[in-house]
Amino acid sequence: MSLTLSALPVVLNLCASTPYIVGILQKRFRPSRSSWIVWSTLDSITLAGMLAKGSANTQIISGWLLSLLIMFSVLHVTKATPWKRREKLYLAGGAFGIVLWGLTSDPLTALITSLAVIECALVPTLEGVWNDPEAEPAIPWLLGGFASVPVLVSLDHWTLANALQPIL
């Protein structure tokens, strides 16, 4: 059962990301470049914090790899535009998490900071969908959200480090 629960988030992430990446490359979807750059960068910090705490799961590992693919797909098809101040603040928040991690020697600090900033980085995507509902398909987002369920069900030890990433 544990193998199934470990594999299911990977399968759901692949099912969500594959048509999303294809749609981006075909220019049918127009995701926020800044959101995906921030997410892939901060997913790297989140994964590092979870690995350091011994709490990494298949959802974050597959999600991290796929977020990198999505980011590079987005960068491949979008024009370079100046970064907004808010977008720079999101990346600075991730850097702040790394600094806190170094100062406190506690990877949970970096994990919490990165996850908070990841949630804030959703704002440009939500603004884009509000202004142009056709810019983002709903199914990949729903499948990605459902990928958290098997991770939560399979947790042996409910700690903040284990449960925070799948919940957010």
Model-predicted regions and their roles:
Residues 1-168:
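Alpha-helical membrane-protein topology signature
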